[in-house]
Every structure is written in structure tokens, then in C-alpha cells.
UniProtKB/Swiss-Prot annotation:
Virulence factor required for growth in low Mg(2+) medium and for intramacrophage survival. May be involved in regulating membrane potential by activating Na(+)/K(+)-ATPase. The keyword Glycoprotein does not apply. Gene3D superfamilies: 3.30.70.260. Belongs to the MgtC/SapB family. One of its GO terms (cellular component) is plasma membrane. InterPro entries: MgtC-like_C, MgtC/SapB/SrpB/YhiD_fam, MgtC_SapB_SrpB_YhiD_N. NCBIfam families: PRK15385.1 (NF011912). This is Protein MgtC. Keywords: Cell inner membrane, Cell membrane, Membrane, Transmembrane, Transmembrane helix, Virulence. The gene is mgtC. It is a multi-pass membrane protein. The keyword Cell inner membrane applies. Its main location: membrane.
Amino acid sequence: MEERMLMFPYILNLLAAMLLGALIGAERQWRQRMAGLRTNALVATGAAVFILSSMTTSPDSPGRIAAQIVSGIGFLGAGVIMREGMNVRGLNTAATLWCSAGIGVLCGLGQFKNALAATIIILCANILLREAAQRINQLPVSAEAEKRYILKVTCNKEDESAVRQWLLNIVKEAAICLQGLGSVPAQEQGYKEIRAELVGHADYRKTRELIISRIGDNDNITAIHWSIDSQ
């Protein structure tokens, strides 16, 4: 009987961590994110297990274990972050996993009220701030804001080095930041498509006009495509 009474707080802490983690994960699942209901529930429960285990073996070590949990969640969060060109996806999901671990730590320490309050705030951040961010994105872009561009240039395979140098000179002259430069075989045999990822001011017309005006200076270029990165 005494053993059951000792087990009850342990189980209660784990159940609270699982339920609150699942509540956070339900919002992620609803939005079809990679880390959904089960992942967040398991992260919160796992964090609570580590805290409870540390309190059992050494009551003075929960703070040290909590720091180790934060480090461990960093590796887990990195697994849901994907880079597609210049776009990075999964940051919100990774941050939510980190928050779920924090909820688990609070539940492991028996701070249920704090854990519930933190869960509500996390849900508000994921739901309400999402709408606010979408409204802000719909506002007119400031001329001083940065914008991402994709510049694709097609040339003969033999002229790739010369065209790359030409692109570097253009970037330097236009005073824009080059984030990435690579090449892939073009659709036509014997040709290369060079892709430059650029970051500059939202008022891109001057940069575009400069690039277009310089196309005639390079006979090695057979095609060029300029676009704004939508992400």
C-alpha cells in the first residue's frame, strides 16, 4: 500500500506532462506539421521522466538535468528543421518541441499550475501570433526591407567559370549579398544553369535593371531568369 502511495505522485506528474504535451502537439497535428501530437507528448513525458529520476537519485540535481534536457532537445529540434535553397522550414516546430520539454520539466517538478499556464501561453503563441504574422506579411513592404531573389543564368559548359566570375562582379557592383552560388546541368545538352541566391533591398528594380543592362556585355550567356523568392 505504501509503495502504491509513493507511485501515485510519480504517475500523476507523468500523466500531466503527457496531457499538456499532447495539448500542444494537437495544434501542430492540426496544422499537419512533422512533430505533432505524439511527438510533443513524448518529449514532455521524457523530460518529466528525467527530472523525476534525478530527484529520486539526487534531490539537488534537477537544475543540472534540466540543462541537459535543453541540450538534448536541441539535437531533436535540428531533425525537424529543413533548408530548401534559401528557405528554412520547421523552426516553429522545433521551438514548440523545446517548449514541450519545458512543460515536462515543470510537471516533473510538480509545478502543475505553472505548467498549465505555460501551455496556454505556448498555444496562444502558435495560434494567435500566427494570424498576427500573416496580417503583418500582407502590409506593404518597406523599401528598406530585405528581399530574397533567385537569379538563374544558362551558358555553355565551357564558359561556366567565366560566367560565375561575371556574376560575382555583378553582385559586387549592385551591392547585394550573395547567399549561395551553384550550378546544375541545363535541359539542353552541353549547357549549364548557374543559380545565384541573392539578398537585397525590397526595391529591386535598380538591381534588376543593372543585371539586364549587363547581359549584353557577356556573349557567353544564352538565357537568364530573375525571380523573387516567395518564401
